[in-house]
A protein has these predicted regions:
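Function-determining sites in protein domains
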Residues: 1-99
Length: 99
């Protein structure tokens, strides 16, 4: 199972992508618990804000898009963990899974 975090926007408008293969993580069960506890169905669309980041978080079968100001609590914890264990790569806008 993979977790993908794509961050777009900001002043430079870059798209950065971090990916983690949970099966390769020594604390896989902790990751799964965090992911299973996320309020995937409660994320609401908000108007875009200039020069702010937007995060697209995917872990099949789930996907959520959050504005920077929505990235709190367990969402922030997940994004921080993904960024700690994965190096970012640049991707073409609209194509975060392209390698």
């Amino acid at each position: 199972m993979d977790v993908t975090v794509a961050r777009s926007g900001g002043l430079a408008g870059l798209l950065l992508v971090w990916e983690v293969d949970l099966d390769r993580q020594p604390d896989r069960d902790a990751w799964k618990g965090l992911i299973d506890g996320l309020p995937w169905d409660e994320v609401r669309a908000v108007p875009p804000e200039p020069d702010r980041f937007v995060y697209r978080i995917r872990c099949e079968p789930h996907e959520a898009t959050l504005a920077e100001r929505q990235l709190t609590g367990p969402w922030r914890e997940l994004v921080d963990r993904v960024r700690e264990v994965s190096e970012p790569r640049r991707a073409a806008p609209g194509r975060p899974r392209a390698r």
